[in-house]
Amino acid sequence: MLRPRTYVRKLAWRCPRKSQLGLRLATSVSSHKSLPLPMNFDISHSQSAFRAYQDIIHRNKSVGDDEPSQRSENENNPSESDKDSNQDPETPKKDKESENDKEPEKEKDIENDNKVSSESNENVTLASSNTGGAAPPNGNNNGDDPDDSNPSLPVDPVTGLYPPLLAIPMKDRPPLPGRPFAINVTDPEVIRSIYTIIDKREPYFVLFHVKDSNEPDTDVINKKDSVYDIGVHCQIIRHTTPRPGVFNVLGYPLERCKLEELTTPSSEKEAKSEEPSKEDAESFPTSYLKGLNVSYATVKPVEDEPYDKSSAEIRSLVESLKTLLSKMGGKNPLEKLQIKEGTDLISDPSKFADFVGSTIHGDPKKIQEILETLNIETRLSRALELLKVELKASLIKESTIHNLSTKADEYQTRLFIKEFIKELQKRAGISESEDKKTSKFDERLKHLKLTEEAMEAYNAEKAKMENQNEHSSELGVSERYLDWLTSIPWGVYSKDHFNIKQAREVLERDHYGLKDVKDRILEFISLGKVSGKVDGKILCLAGPPGTGKTSIAKSIAESLNRKYVRIAMGGIQDVHEVKGHRRTYVGSIPGRIISALKQAKTSNPLMLIDEIDKLDLSRGGGAASAFLEILDPEQNNSFVDNYIDVKVDLSKVLFVCTANYLGNIPAPLRDRMEIIDVSGYTNNEKIEIAKRHLIPEASKKAGLETNHVSITNETISRLIEKYCRESGLRNVKKLITRIFSKASLKIVEEIEAKEALDSSKEKEGVTASSEEANVNSESTKSNTSQAEPVAESSTDISTKSKVASEKIETKEKKETNKENGQSEEDQQPEPKFVIPEDIKLEITPANLKDYVGPEIYTRDRVYEFPPPGVATGLSYSTSGNGDALYIESILTHSIGSGSGVPGMHVTGSLKDVMKESASIAYSFTKSFMAKNYPDNRFFEAADIHVHCPDGAIPKDGPSAGISFTSSLVSLAINESLPPTVAMTGEITVTGRVLPVGGLREKILGAKRYGCDTIIFPKDIENELEEIPDEVKDGVTFIPVEWYQEVFDKIFPNATAQKCNEVWKEEFAKLDSKKKNKKK
């Protein structure tokens, strides 16, 4: 029994490749000869092939209904013997002889089948095109089957829908019908489904563009709203696996289609829960997609709107597209071939528009608009718009490439010419040393005295530079190194002037007071005059901000006739900022020291290391370690910068450092310095400095003379006492500058008001005179109208000629200024504003607040009559300012209530040392009271809270020890301390008073707060001798060694009986409460 070849081919497409039937069918299909198919196989192993065969028969019937033919009927309806064989597939064959007898008959049947097969295929293709499907392109399915024809899926005649097809989303630009495209699939389920539809010989799927490009990449459509409704119906041409897990599909868009219904994996799972019947599962041809975890969609073919090819609008658009496409071709043969292929489609405007949309690289959303456009004229217009943008971008790209190519050619030409000239000069023996970049460095060397090591480094780098190519990147590195090396003032020194008289005059001129500082500086200069040098000295000016440390360094430089350079240390945290970076780093430069020498242009300047206590030590102190070498006289004669990499002698440099707080400087670095204390100024010193320096400077900057604005001594004193209580003068300078600024404003407003008044009076006078002139002119009008013109006088002629010559000169000046690029306003400076001498302002204590605002310090003391438990201590801040520090102690609960817990807690941003000092004071006070006043049981029940005001300011140090003790003793005996007594000193648990620092500043702070008595440790009594009498005036000093001496001075009226019985009643109440509780 033989089957027609067409049916064999259909079965080969549907049959599993590994089965016996599939192998035989594939062999018979791939063979050019008609091979018989003996029915001796076990059909039970290939039931799917027979089901596929029945589907083919059913499909061919539906396709062939429109154009029936006898041959198609013969092909779709097998003979009765075939049916019998299908009903009984296991019927054995007859013997070989009967089979051989029918051999000629079989050959005839096969030849007829071949004819019928070809005609049937033509009929199927025609039918598919009539039902809305597009003819598939030529190609094969990955080489599995050489035959190119695939059965087209039918469109339901009632609904006009295709059966459900595999639906795949696409985030890239959507494809348009007629142009193949490629997609990568990574979802294993989708890959399995593609294999399935290929095996089923239904290699079709639908592709829809994703609306939101930010959605995660997926090969399954999870929501219908996530994709556009219009997509493309595609056929698989070829598929490959470029790498594991990636499946590449080459598809051919057949036609546009509209999404009607989408089934997602989630919706399919819900449907499965209802357990559909077997008939429902086989209700459509592609029902096998239900078993796969993919999305499939029911789509409807979309046809273009009717149009007229001969329409003028369409023809114009087509011609415009064709013209622009010819310009897009360029010089690329592949692009020319593609564009030629597209221009062949101009007879079909619809396909031509799709071709243009597929060719250009436009926005995916714009391409989707072309896909969704069914009006051909609109589609052509949108394609033309995108093509214009593409052409413009292409022209810009081409122009850019051309410009770059031209520049590269010019560069190569110049390079060739330079090298050619260089070679000619070399052949001719012409020296080119004058043209070398090293000539300027050689000129510098004539004025320098380089060390032997530096000269070797210079010669080596110079030779390296000469041998390098002109365009080498190393050339700039070598040139920059030689520039720095020759910028160091090797062997250049300024002559020192050791004139004590001149130095004293300079110091007195620039600074008032600071007698100790001036004496130390003059001693330093005198040592230099005796020894002939000042090498090896490192001075450190330590004191509060605004006390003139930087200006003192400038005065020293002027006195010695040395260059002055300043290096600010604020924020320096890296050693490379001091010693430079090595040349291996890109953009490396020398450190601050070499840069300062280059700026000074001498090897012995005065180098100010400003704010050395602000060095950042957070990175292990790298910068501080570098200064150990720089500021050590034994080492700085061979300082090596990382960039220069040559020893530089810094022993002739006079280093002067400034610091606000010496505690922030590392101890090894502090030991190398000679410390000079620059203490704060007294009020009298501030007044004199303001009169001598600050007021004249502020007056000059404001453009006012000192006789226009006068500030009395009382005003300056009030300004210092009520606004500026710090040790320095910076705030005083700011406020004086503000006074002159507001005074200038008031003076200008007063002058402008006067001028406005005068101008109004002048206008009134001019109006009156003009009225009189009008009356006189009317009276003489009749006489002058009949008079003959009189000849001009010689005076009038000379006046006119003078005016004319001035105009000519003015015109020439304007032309000259115009040629020089200067305007007339630039040539004429603004005239200085002249202030009349009768305008004067006087700044008095009464009107001072009109210029600087309300007073900051309204009273000298916080407590005029302090309550028990309040003591006045003295503090010394890191900025160098002395201040009063109040210690307040209270009882949180009354003694008689018995609700408090005996003990003490402290507040006020106290750090560890100060907390320990308070704890020591509490322990000593308990011991002191128990020893001297045993009947005073205060500490048995007292819950004490100790506080230091200004809680936002951190406080630390041991100097408040006796202040804590006095506050607790005052609370224990319930007696107040004198308001004008301040104290400072560290306390021990035995009552010994130990020395503290900053006595001078603390004295100034005590005086500012109205304290006239200061208790201090006896061990620092000798420091009083060094403090100026002006600071000590009006203050009584009480040196103490033990706390008992402090107690006797601050509580002179305290008796033993009073101190023992002060809390007697409260403890009686407490005892009675305790007894009642026991009962």
Curated annotation (Swiss-Prot):
EC primary class: hydrolase
EC number(s) recorded for this UniProt protein: 3.4.21.53
Keyword annotations: ATP-binding, DNA-binding, Hydrolase, Mitochondrion, Nucleotide-binding, Protease, Serine protease, Transit peptide
Catalytic activity: Hydrolysis of proteins in presence of ATP
Family: Belongs to the peptidase S16 family.
PANTHER family in UniProt: LON PROTEASE, LON PROTEASE HOMOLOG, MITOCHONDRIAL
Protein name per the record: Lon protease homolog, mitochondrial
Gene from which this protein is expressed: PIM1
